[in-house]
């Protein structure tokens, strides 16, 4: 059971927004204060069939409407334990609430037939936040009951406890804030799930804690009179019993280093998809469950937490009217070739998901200097929320640009002018004034009388006075369609025009020594007024997109 899509109207800053979800895991990203955590809060109220306070209404005079598309069962043989004759696999429901209502109303979205609120409670929702003490809300009696059950299970399935592990758990009990049973439960789970091989490692405290949180919530559901567990359990054609569970995690990056962030989120997915045999055996023995059927929602501001698949990403953004909308990776429809490039380049563009605009450049030298150029021309990238991406070649720019545009991220791209005929009709593209970056730089510096400054940059880059070789000049002249015989090799500072301009020598050296370190030196050395106009134009265009949103 999972949510396939949701339309939210009149809730907080969601005037009218539609979202499509991945059945397994969804990562919500976007700017601060755009509604990501508010969405998780809405899930909690919705699954509990509670009314929302007046402050949550976008317009208190209008009702809040939430239209849900739910995938209930996997086949005609499946059913809910308390409704064996009902084999409905999918349904669309609408939850409505007015500010004056005591409780919300539930309707079949296709027939408008009013449904009992108990129907929405088939959704079991569990939330975790790194900034709240969720574990403290659980009564100590619950952990003590779990400790008893887990200790018996551990004693019958595991070997004797080594002395170092006994000392470690005693230390946790002595210095911890919770009842001792809480730490005992973590300890037992670490052994049951075979995660105590490094008794002081993070996996003992955090990965086992993830399992404890799920076990605790299942225990509370199994012992609750509000919603009987049988109301939620799905029985398949083989008689196996599964508990549908939606879990949300808000800001997992707090207190966790990048590897542990990913490890924790991956482990939650393993639990929800029954990929841990020991955990499944524990569910079977303690609760009579053969597994879970879960969907994960993660709100994060950390690129380290994000999965490397665009299909699991849901980005919230503001349109040209300032309204919050959603770009959902699960709903993208792309060709096979484009999809290959989307997956291949996605790790490079994660940071752009949080940006207000993006600049795409062809190579390493541009990548090394553009952020420094931005500071020089008065458009600091971090302040404006501008992300700079190295496409590693002209052919990749269009593909990465397409991916970013799918997520409704404003993009400008800088191409070398030698490909202008191919790309000039595309939206949001800019071109160098000369045939490439190196020509613009060398021409601009020499035209402004900054030859000495360019010599200093090259001297720092190579540790000696710059020299052009025959191969450098041959390569450059081939690019420029000039005769290399007109440009004898030698020290740059001695270069003089013979049958061609001096900038060709500097172009030849720069063209043969591309790299991010050279780019960094160029960015650090050029002052305002020295940055080539073509580069200023693209930076200012990105700055404008970052301040005046135009989706």
Regions found by a protein language model. Give the residues of each.
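Switch/communication elements of ASCE P-loop NTPase nucleotide-binding domains
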Residues: 1-48, 200-348, 545
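Hydrophobic/aromatic beta-strand patches that form the interior of the parallel beta-sheet core
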Residues: 28, 126-128, 297, 314, ...
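Conserved P-loop NTP-binding catalytic core
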Residues: 29, 38-87
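Glycine-rich phosphate-binding loops of NTPases
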Residues: 54-56, 74-159
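Short glycine-/polar-rich loops that comprise or flank the Walker A/P-loop
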Residues: 62-68, 88-93, 120-126, 243-244, ...
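Conserved nucleotide-binding/hydrolysis micro-motifs of P-loop NTPases
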Residues: 72-75, 101, 132-135, 253, ...
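Extended helical coiled-coil dimerization/tether regions that scaffold
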Residues: 128, 132-249
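Acidic, Mg2+-coordinating catalytic modules of nucleic-acid enzymes
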Residues: 345-360, 364-551
